Amino acid sequence: MGVSYISNIFVNTKGVSITPFNNKHVSSVYDNQNNIVTKLDKEKTPYVSYEDLPDVFIDALLCTEDVRFFTHNGIDIPRILSAIKTNLSSNSYAQGASTLTQQFIKNTMLTSNKTLKRKFEEMYLAHKIEKIYSKKEIIELYVNYICFDGINPGVNHASLKYYNKPINLVTLPEAALLVGIVNLPTYYNPFKNPVAATKRRNEVLDLMVKHNRLSHYQAEVAKSFPIEKMLYKSNKQEKEYPFQAYLDIVYSQIEDLTGLDPFTTPMKIYTYLDTTLQAEIDLMQKNNSSYLKFTNDLQQFAASIINNENGSIIAAFGGRNYNGQRLFNRAYDMVKQPASTIKPLLSYALAYEHLNWSDKHTVLDDTTYYPNTNQEVNNVDFKHMGEMMIDEAIGYSRNTIAVKTLQEVVGLIGKDKVLEYLKSINLLDTNSFNYSYALGAFEYGVSPTQLAAAYGMLANQGIYKTPLAVKEIVLLENNKKISFTIQSKRILNNDSVYLLNSVLESMMSKNFWNINSICPKNVQISAKTGTSSFDEKVLTDFNYPKNAYKDRWLAGYCKNITIAAWTGFDTTLKEQKTYFIPNNTDANVVKTFFKRIMDIAAKKNQSYDKPDSIVTIPIVKGSNPYLLPTQSVNKNYIINAQFKKDSIPSLYICEPTITQFIEYDYFLSKDKVTILLANDLFDKKETTNKIFDYEKIYGNLEVICEISHDYTTSTFILDSSINEIPLSYKQISTINVYYKYKNGHNTGPFNNKIIIY
């Protein structure tokens, strides 16, 4: 199993042995303190040949997973086309149509992320494999390398575990159960969820009837066997695999970097494993932690923890019930759309790098469209909040501002530079650009390890470090040492990241959505959450609540460690709670996990040094472009802001020129003049939130009336549409009406009229 094994398919001949290579020496693994943590003395599992498989098992497998297996060439074209049509119409990839050959490829070489790209990869490799191996050999590979119980490879493992008998002795109802649980072994675990397992077994039996492998009577008889009575309840404790989620990452990286398989090439393996953290995570994976509890059996979890000092992976949450070797590792192999966790990394990191923003920058949340389209950018609440500080925009996760910011960045540096940036932090999942990237709507997605490493770049003042779990290997055959260096590269300038970190720290201190609950005492945390929503068609088709969402991320860091955690579901299922809704605590496990890891590993009372290139100066709050205050500006409208030295503002605020002209009428009566103004002149302004307004600085804009006679001028403030002004003289007078700020000096254009008595 694994990359090195599958590679043999393409370079060697049909006669290559598929049983594990035996060697008198075995590999050993060491933690970050050079203590041995395990030896790779692989458990001997009886290899199952095709001839060992009973007909009832083969029939159940093919009727359920691949009914045309013996007639296609690795690709079931009708099912593929049907699935693609369904997925495109629903704008999702929930529908699958993998043949057995494709499933084998997916589980031994590719990620299990449901994308069209992966489907095409499966199709290509499946077609190639079917030219090398016979149909019976492919089934043989499948049943020996797929984890039927979700833990150990091979159907024989599952058969011995559940029935205490080898696969060749299983009965029809036993075979149907084994086939039924393989696609969701955790949920359909017959020991933990016998009701769901029974329902699934019966579905398999019905499929066998549908495809004429059973009579209706035979199926009903098989359904009559209670699952609880079929199972073998052993007193033998199931084998434990300590630290396995982390170790599987180590094995994958060794294969990727050297092409060597630690299970077949004996070696000493030195890692960055933090056993204290990983032991805590192991308890969480088994749902045995007093800090973290899961209540939904279908809910999954994944996380990666990185040491910021050297960029190493020090612990990983590979998935719930992660107990076995070389399982699908959600911390390393799974990719999901990063949602709003991308905002600090993309729009705002590039804004501070290229747009020279201050940490007190003001932005506007208003109606926004994706560039060159008529598609509106919606916030999660479908509302707009007006002007706000940048820390509020991140805290409230305003989508409009993230998209507008990215658009401004693209306007300055171009789309190609944005793609280069994403590639430099290993978050580029396609070579095409899309403004929806600003919201984390990637074509495929990122893994928790990828996201943690990217956030680690912010923790490391702009230096990206390629995440490694393996430090060094020593081959036992010749004592050859192979060391692996974590590559470091500056991506963003130190001062840009310092300003962004200042914003994130301010955002955390304001405790948006109770985000500050993840912070241990005396530890400065910067973090961002993210949620992915369902397409409207999926909500309708699956009868989910309108406010249901797919998953939740939490990514963040203190000075010494970075964490990226995800929770969600492997598969979207009808009539099952494979979704979250607001105010439901199930998704909050990312916060609980984050806080617990920080409690254990975060160093207290650490902060970032302020670069010499950063200066702090007072500006008029909310001004954009930035304005320096004069002595007349009230201190309530002044805020200290940090800037790069080469982008300090130089323009002082000054009273604006008033250009509005006021139309009015008047009529005379005894001893007074009545001035008539438009009814809407005194209407209240829009209530849209504004941080900066000249009326806050210079007072309200007032309507002034001057009545002049000879060398005497009387001034009145008009405050309604009808204004009566007494006159003490009956001669020719001049009347002027104009705007003026209450505390200002400038006046608007005069509208002079002559009063003749």
Predicted regions and their residues:
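Juxtamembrane regions of bacterial inner-membrane/periplasmic proteins
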Residues: 1-286, 290, 313-314
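Short pre-catalytic segments that frame enzyme active sites
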Residues: 28, 33-46, 157, 161, ...
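Bacterial peptidoglycan biogenesis and beta-lactam-recognition machinery
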Residues: 53, 63-76, 89-94, 130-136, ...
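Conserved catalytic neighborhood of penicillin-recognizing serine enzymes
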Residues: 89-113, 235-239, 356-418, 434, ...
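A penicillin-recognizing enzyme superfamily signal
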Residues: 271-292, 304-305, 316, 323-334, ...
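Conserved aromatic anchor
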Residues: 673-683
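Surface-exposed, short loops/turns at beta-strand junctions within beta-sandwich domains
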Residues: 725-733
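Extracellular fibronectin type III
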Residues: 744-755
